[in-house]
Amino acid sequence: LARYKRAKNLDVFFLTGTDEHGQKIQKAAQACDKSPIEFVNGVVDKFKTLWNDLNISHDDFIRTTEDRHCRRVKKIFQQIQENGDIYLGEYEGWYCVPCESFWIESQLKERKCPECNRSVEKVKEKNYFFRLSKYQKSLLEHHEKHPHFIQPESRRNELLQRIKSPVEDISISRSAIEWGIQVPSDHTHTIYVWIDALLNYITALGYDDDMQKFQKYWPASVHIIG
């Protein structure tokens, strides 16, 4: 897609990178008798070699362990917290380590992850939560006003059904995981990997440091998920 757009003389910023934090990485490193950073360094080298062999010409390759990313994630977390959208609560439920996903009892069959069919772990811990429920109405309005925002149609319908159902606040920190970005105001917590990792799309564009570049390329014209 980036090659096609460049061939049409359009200004393209193609971003890729690696998601390097979380319990899955921590456990994989332990199994290899390596520190987490040693483990991810080896994996990143393989990815970069692969992209080169495939002639994939990205404009930036961001690692979520880089200082530019970690620093900006902390800043964004603080901004959300100052806006009153983060609070400390307690999570009790099921967690899939390979998928790094939380599940409730009703979503499980024989206590297997709905995504990968592996066994899930029972978790009970203090977490920071994001007030997603506060934005249910605005999310629904956005998707109804922009019918082509998500494609294909089947995925759009799936998401709309989830938004129309009761929307729960989501856990955005872990108190039992050391390998991650620390919550700025509470170093006993690390920021949940799916919050940390997904923010790379804007941290790589210089959010809060290089706003000229950020405003030039964000929001993204195309965001491929999968």
Residues covered by each model-derived region:
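A short alpha-helix-loop-beta-strand transition element characteristic
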Residues: 84-90, 120-122
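Structured secondary-structure scaffolds
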Residues: 1-16, 63, 68-72, 98, ...
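Short metal-coordination and nucleic-acid-contact micro-motifs, chiefly zinc-binding Cys/His arrays
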Residues: 90-92, 109-110
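Hydrophobic alpha-helical membrane-insertion segments
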Residues: 26-28, 107, 205, 209
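The −1 position to Zn-ligating cysteines in a subset of zinc-ribbon hairpins
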Residues: 79, 95, 102, 112, ...
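N-terminal Rossmann-like or analogous alpha/beta NTP/dinucleotide-binding catalytic cores
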Residues: 1-87, 100
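Cys/His-rich microdomains that often coordinate metals
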Residues: 103, 119-120
